[in-house]
């Protein structure tokens, strides 16, 4: 597993940085060179997210059938081809079409595919591997915004995208193919005494119960996706509307990445002692109070910093939860298809949320906009609590009805080992 985590860690930094985050530093140069509005430039990214949502279930099923190794390797080829094509577009329709093509490749390369790959490579250690992998991903924007800015200064945005395409072929493609070539047989994690460790999670859900749980968890992630979709694009304007000057808003917004990384480290150190669904309840539950900090009166720097740190930590842990909870509730069987089904509404909401939030603030102001974020976070928390209590009740019913529970008898006091 360490080889797979390291390989995927490198590819996640590269794939996220060169595709998902590339407009962070290249949108301005593209707009200036082509005379397209920045809004139109970012519309391409919205198209990619929508396509990712549309193809998500199909990609997930293909990962289960063909293996993540094949899908992610092909995804590297598609991302490279899309970036190369993007470097040569000169018309608006072609620009949007290339982003649609990139959306397919991105869905085959980014977190959901990588989570499924780790579960296929190391079924017994999937949750731990997912936690480690997200630590790598936290550096993607930091690394490639610097790299992209430097390359654009030297060779321009078109050649920068060509170099990004080459990185996907030279780095991601071989690492996906070679790093995912070995799988361990499913087994329990070893204890210090050498025996299998008892599972911290309950048996996977089946049948109608499984379907209902998938719908509930997809609802939780979609409601959170609305909040994080807005924050990812409009955090600086949100902080400015709270009363910060632009320079201060940019500085505070930069703390979000630090908080994401910190949240993931805390989950790795302490979250292993908790069930995945418990970690999810904590991460989802932190978000509404953090948003309240923006609404308690005149904003102070300390309150805004506290909001950013809590929100960032929540987002960082929820990235892990998105892969760990389905593994705990539904098991490794058809894991790729389950992630694909959950990701479909999440990605579509992510794509639509910045525009929807902009419409809300333009029509009713920033106060109503903040209320919409709080409502989304509160509904996500409520849905998470309903899901958790429902799941616990179903589990207790299953345990009390199980033959082992009904027929178990205590060992006689006078029994002797033979």
Predicted regions and their residues:
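Hydrophobic core of transmembrane alpha-helices in multi-pass small-molecule transporters
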Residues: 13, 82, 93-109, 222, ...
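Extracytoplasmic gate region of multi-pass secondary transporters
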Residues: 23-27, 210-262
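Intracellular juxtamembrane helix-capping segments at the cytosolic ends
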Residues: 30, 108-122, 317-330
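Interfacial helix-cap and linker-helix signal at transmembrane-aqueous boundaries
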Residues: 30-31, 62-63, 146-155, 239-240, ...
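Conserved MFS/SLC helix-loop-helix module at the cytosolic interface between two early adjacent transmembrane helices
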Residues: 54-92
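Helix-to-loop junctions at the C-terminal end of transmembrane segments
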Residues: 55-67, 263-276, 361-362
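Symmetry-related core transmembrane helices of the 12-TM Major Facilitator Superfamily/SLC fold
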Residues: 159-178, 370-388
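C-terminal transmembrane helical hairpin of 12-TM major facilitator-type secondary transporters
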Residues: 256, 274-325
